[in-house]
Design a protein with these regions (language model features):
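Active-site-proximal N-terminal segment of extracellular/periplasmic enzymes that hydrolyze or transfer
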Residues: 4-44, 53, 94
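Short, solvent-exposed turn/loop segments enriched in Gly/Ser/Thr/Pro and often Arg
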Residues: 26-27, 43-65, 102-113, 186-191
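A short beta-strand-to-alpha-helix junction
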Residues: 6, 29-32, 50-55, 79-86, ...
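Catalytic-site neighborhoods of secreted/periplasmic enzymes
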Residues: 65-158, 165
Length: 210
């Protein structure tokens, strides 16, 4: 890349525990991922890209380092302290002058403090619960939404993790007028506990019609 060519922004959008065929691009008949589908349909689609591990942490550590779990020594969701590598993707972007951000689920060897901006969410809500709404929603996820919660989530969309995360990610990106950035938007969903504006009982009826 020449000195005159502006550096491209790099955004990784990730979902957690989602089957590859549960999206419109792969022919799934319900519009559950319309925005992701629009990206997939207008860009390159790698239909033979497979994860290196069926567990979260090994796969994420491999994504950041380009190394197999056998090389990183991280083979489970509980041993990132064993992580072995020389340099990861985050360090490379920083060396190239990129601003860096994480919004969402980490679950890798990197730390929140390694990013210029970090808003961490996990399956049970925002890690740093700054507002009463954050606390109330985390209580719901921890105590009422465990297992198979079959009703619509009793919170508006704006209070639920996905919408909050996208809102924060967009706000940060719009502030980066003078710097190229790398941003990792890592959705904890659709991994349970589930959040939905639609009753799961209604969804079951729809699925039976497919």
């Amino acid at each position: 890349m020449s000195a005159q060519t502006p550096k491209p922004n790099v955004v990784i959008i990730m979902t957690d525990q989602q089957r590859a065929d549960l999206c419109g691009r792969e022919g799934f008949p319900m519009a559950v991922t319309p925005f992701a589908d629009s990206l997939a349909l207008s860009n390159v689609w790698f239909d033979k890209a497979y994860t290196v591990a069926p567990a979260s942490m090994p796969a994420r550590c491999s994504m950041f380092t380009g190394r197999y779990p056998t090389a990183t020594h991280v083979r489970t969701n509980h041993n990132t302290l064993d992580m072995y590598y020389k340099k990861d993707m985050l360090e490379v972007f920083k060396e190239q002058g990129y601003k860096t951000a994480l919004v969402g689920k980490n679950h890798a060897h990197v730390k929140g403090k390694d990013f210029d901006y970090c808003e961490e969410y996990f399956h049970w809500g925002k890690n740093q619960r700054d507002t009463q709404e954050d606390k109330d929603f985390a209580f719901f996820l921890n105590n009422k939404a465990r297992g198979q919660y079959l009703e619509a989530t009793p919170f508006p969309a704006e209070a639920q993790n996905p919408v909050k995360m996208v809102t924060k990610a967009l706000a940060w990106a719009e502030q980066q007028k003078d710097s190229a950035f790398f941003m990792w938007v890592s959705m904890p969903e659709p991994h349970n506990p589930y959040q939905s504006l639609i009753s799961q009982c209604f969804l079951r009826k729809r699925y039976r019609q497919l």
